[in-house]
A protein has these predicted regions:
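N-terminal hydrophobic/helix-forming segments and targeting peptides
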Residues: 1-240
């Protein structure tokens, strides 16, 4: 599983002292408009701001509804009295600083966890919970198991390094896709047979299906058209 997440990086400071961003991972600007964010500087200072359209007032911008939300059209407005690039630089903000968006985490009375960026922290929690269960129940797996938590999955190379040499099989535990053309529901285990990089190992997928059936787990098998995993990154780095 992976514990890294999506965000932004300052790629420039414009003449108004506002921040232009470049995506970290697949952070879609459509999903972050008007979101509160934090800017982490190299000096350790943290500044708050809002990620919004450059011409953000619908009362002023006649093209507001028609403007594509892209990183070129959007900016971070700092919660500081800055009016120029020099003002912002004086705060210690510079190109390369990390920008984190508010996850807006909520746990409902009915037990639902709602938040941005649950991908893939929930899976990390599940694996740690499984390890705790094995220890407390004094159960020993029939095979040697590593829990490998990566921190570069969202940028594509998380599973390509630091995999122990004696590993014979890699199972990537990640979010499950739900959407048009897929059969999985939010309450099921999702088994990915193929993603944008091609099919996964036939025998491994078959074994996962059989394990789910044996355990009487509700599951679905799907193809993810726009996805890649740490297991795929491992394969691309000769972890066959």
């Amino acid at each position: 599983a992976h514990m890294d997440t999506l965000g932004g990086m300052v790629c420039s400071i414009n003449e108004k002292g506002r921040l232009m961003l470049s995506a970290l991972g697949g952070m879609n600007p459509n999903n972050a408009e008007a979101e509160n964010c934090r800017v982490y500087t190299r000096s350790g200072k943290v500044y708050s701001g809002t990620f919004q359209l450059k011409n953000a007032s619908i009362h002023v911008n006649g093209s507001y509804n028609d403007t594509a939300r892209s990183y070129d059209a959007m900016e971070v407005v700092l919660d500081e009295p800055v009016e120029s690039k020099a003002d912002t630089e004086a705060l210690g903000i510079m190109t390369g600083d990390i920008v984190c968006f508010d996850p807006r985490t909520t746990v409902t009375e009915s037990g639902y966890i709602k938040s941005r960026f649950l991908d893939d922290k929930l899976s990390v929690g599940i694996l740690l919970g499984f390890a705790k269960y094995l220890k407390e129940s004094d159960k020993k797996p029939a095979r040697k198991i590593y829990q490998h938590i990566t921190v570069f999955e969202e940028v594509g190379h998380g599973g390509s390094a630091s995999i122990p040499a004696d590993v014979a099989e890699i199972l990537a535990v990640d979010m499950g896709c739900v959407g048009d053309g897929l059969s999985c529901k939010e309450t099921q285990v999702s088994i990915c047979a193929k993603d944008s990089g091609g099919p996964y190992h036939y025998d491994v997928v078959s074994a996962l299906i059989e394990a789910a059936r044996t355990a009487k787990v509700d599951f679905a098998v799907d193809v993810y058209p726009h996805y890649g995993s740490d297991a795929e990154a491992g394969l691309r780095n000769d972890k066959d």
